[in-house]
Amino acid sequence: MATVSMRDMLQAGVHFGHQTRYWNPKMKPFIFGARNKVHIINLEKTVPMANAALAELTKISSRKGKILFVGTKRAASEAVKEYATGCDQFFVNHRWLGGMLTNWKTVRQSIKRLKDLEIQSQDGTFDKLTKKEALMRTRELAKLENSLGGIKDMGGLPDALFVIDADHEHIAIKEANNLGIPVFSIVDTNSDPDGVDFIIPGNDDAIRAIKLYLTAVAAAVREGRSQDLAVQAEESFVEAE
């Protein structure tokens, strides 16, 4: 079972929150105290909450659920793409476009345009265009790939969101709430935990901490997938008998 230990969290600096003056009082239950005007997160709370979230993510992916990883700030962007891709899931790692979930119909049209442009760039269509037109389409393709590349093969709304920074990604969380999509999120001491179904109190800035969360979530997803495959294999074996 995918889990994270207290030791892993301490080594990655998960317990370091933000400066005390930036705190959100709603995070008080998860704060151990303060050191040098920086809040210290209570890992006695974080460890079981993180492991409960991982168990639920395993369950969702064992039912073929789609997990959308969201981390658009610089510290998280590259890692979010790497780990989401590594477990065959989906991601938004640049700007969250308003309506990405709540206006899926429009987003789907943009994804279709992205895929059309990808085909045109490969089948020689671009070569037949004027230099100016080809350049315009190349730029449009790059822009669409940047914003929608991570969800172009999602084929519909996700079954869960895994978010790195609840404060930074509040629009994504609000959209998921409106649609009843469960939200799993790292929530630092400066963030509002409201709207997050599975709160993981922790540092959302340190790259080591971010990679620790992503490694664990990717492992949980892969574990869920392998359970699903094992069930499928068992069912086909029974049918064969």
Swiss-Prot record:
Leader sequence segment: none
DNA damage is among the record's keywords: no
Keywords carried by this UniProt record: Ribonucleoprotein, Ribosomal protein
HAMAP family in the record: Ribosomal_uS2_B (MF_00291_B)
Gene symbol of the encoding locus: rpsB
One term under GO cellular component: cytosolic small ribosomal subunit
One GO BP annotation of this record: translation
Organism listed in the record: Serratia proteamaculans (strain 568)
A GO term for molecular function: structural constituent of ribosome
Protein family per UniProt: Belongs to the universal ribosomal protein uS2 family.
Top-rank taxon, per record: Bacteria
Protein name, as recorded: Small ribosomal subunit protein uS2
